[in-house]
């Protein structure tokens, strides 16, 4: 429920079919309230921007330009905080050194294109 209105960025085939099959076969269900959210998606791309951008010194701000949470809590926890912001939007703010670190990641390079 915390991420009910989050942008989905998983595989399009992930529709919960395995859960339905398991239930139909009488499998026990547990921990279905768990999730892995991500607080950094490249705008217009749906590509997760890996969290080292933040753990190495970047921060996130809302549309008003204000930092709204402690990003050190983790990217799943931060995803919930982003959803609490106007328009469910946050901007990652970082410097050239963080940019250089992130260039090693293919997803980051794709998001730049």
Language-model-derived ranges and their functions:
Residues 19-21, 27-113:
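An anion/pyrophosphate-binding glycine-rich loop and adjacent beta-alpha core
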Residues 9-21:
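Thiamine diphosphate
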Residues 1-10:
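Glycine-rich beta-alpha-beta "Rossmann" dinucleotide-binding loop(s) and their flanking helix/strand
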């Amino acid at each position: 429920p915390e991420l009910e209105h989050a942008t989905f960025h998983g595989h399009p085939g992930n529709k919960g079919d395995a859960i339905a099959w398991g239930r139909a076969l009488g499998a026990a269900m547990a921990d279905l309230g768990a999730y892995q959210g991500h607080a950094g998606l490249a705008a217009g791309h749906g590509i997760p921007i890996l969290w080292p951008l933040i753990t190495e010194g970047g921060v996130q701000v809302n549309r008003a330009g204000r930092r709204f949470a402690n990003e050190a809590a983790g990217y799943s926890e931060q995803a919930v905080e982003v959803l609490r912001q106007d328009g469910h939007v946050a901007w990652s703010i970082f410097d050239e050194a963080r940019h250089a670190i992130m260039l090693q990641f293919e997803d980051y390079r794709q998001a730049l294109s």
